[in-house]
Amino acid sequence: MGEALTKEEIDDLADRWYKALDVHAPVEELHAMLLDEGNEMMWPEGPTHGHKEFTGWYDRVTRIFFDEVHTLTKVDSKIDGESADVEVVVNWQAKVWNPPEPNSKWLGFDAYQTWEVVRSPDTGQAVIKRYVVDKLDPMPGSTEL
């Protein structure tokens, strides 16, 4: 049995995850925060499993959304040893441009998510095993997804 996860590790993981998404970090930086085998991500666009499918999703969305800002408003962890169920709420704002429209459009949502975080068998670090976008609440004036 390995070391139990801590709230601080999970908070740090969530913070690093959204900072990487904001800057469209190289996908390898995000892979380091995700379990590969056994990983499941439930996006509004559809599910991904493992690093390979995540990379396909990431390549698509980083070519659609820009000027992204993710602001964490809640990270509530229920830790059980080397795994944790985590409620995450993040305010996500971005722009999208649909050619040949003359202007980009603003998007703003509060995203309610559920994560399962585990300790990586390879690195010993806290990583995301399962990531579910439960609900997107649009902000006033937001374009629809």
What are these regions (language model features)?
Residues 27-81:
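A solvent-exposed, acidic/Ser-Thr-rich amphipathic alpha-helical stretch
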Residues 85, 105-145:
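Short beta-strand edge/turn micro-motifs at domain boundaries
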Residues 43, 88-90, 130:
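Residue-level recognition of conserved beta-strand positions in structured domain cores
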Residues 63-67, 92-107, 137-142:
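Short, cysteine-centered beta-strand-loop-beta hairpins and adjacent loop/turn segments enriched
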Residues 34, 90-94, 132-135:
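Short beta-strand segments enriched in hydrophobic/aromatic residues
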Residues 80-97, 111:
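A short hydrophobic beta-strand element
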